Amino acid sequence: MVKLAFPRELRLLTPTHFTFVFQQPQRAGTPQITILGRLNQLGHPRIGLTVAKKHVKRAHERNRIKRLTRESFRLRQHELPAMDFVVVAKKGIADLDNRALTEALEKLWRRHCRQAPAS
């Protein structure tokens, strides 16, 4: 049985990890959300989240966006390539309902799977 946990090893934790992705990213995006990705040598994907207070004013909305993004990643982690991902929320993301946000994330994960070089 496949484990769908979200342990610490699957998260980008330090500014160095984020900087690594920002240097040479592969981009996939919609008007409300962008996912940056860069291949890593770890053999598994990792995720980092940036939801700026400038774009999403209320804390409960920022938390909802982060929660749904983590859940989407957790469920697809075994299908994703070994890349470090940074999810960047943009203006207007708070207007998306849960279903629309989940569908947008699924579309972007599929796009990253297609863009990733075959290993």
From Swiss-Prot:
MF terms in GO: 3'-tRNA processing endoribonuclease activity; ribonuclease P activity; tRNA binding
Catalytic function, reaction form: Endonucleolytic cleavage of RNA, removing 5'-extranucleotides from tRNA precursor
Tree of life domain: Bacteria
Keyword annotations of the record: Endonuclease, Hydrolase, Nuclease, RNA-binding, tRNA processing
Annotated EC: 3.1.26.5
PROSITE patterns to which the protein is assigned, alphabetical: RIBONUCLEASE_P (PS00648)
Record-level GO cellular component terms: ribonuclease P complex
InterPro entries tied to this protein: Ribosomal_Su5_D2-typ_SF (IPR020568), Ribsml_uS5_D2-typ_fold_subgr (IPR014721), RNase_P (IPR000100), RNase_P_CS (IPR020539)
Claim: Nuclease is one of the keywords in the record: yes
Pfam families attached to this UniProt entry: Ribonuclease_P (PF00825)
Cysteines paired by S-S bonds: none
Biological process, per Gene Ontology: tRNA 5'-leader removal
HAMAP family registered for this protein in UniProt: RNase_P
Protein family (similarity comment): Belongs to the RnpA family.
Biological function: RNaseP catalyzes the removal of the 5'-leader sequence from pre-tRNA to produce the mature 5'-terminus. It can also cleave other RNA substrates such as 4.5S RNA. The protein component plays an auxiliary but essential role in vivo by binding to the 5'-leader sequence and broadening the substrate specificity of the ribozyme.
Subunit structure: Consists of a catalytic RNA component (M1 or rnpB) and a protein subunit.
Name this protein carries in UniProt: Ribonuclease P protein component
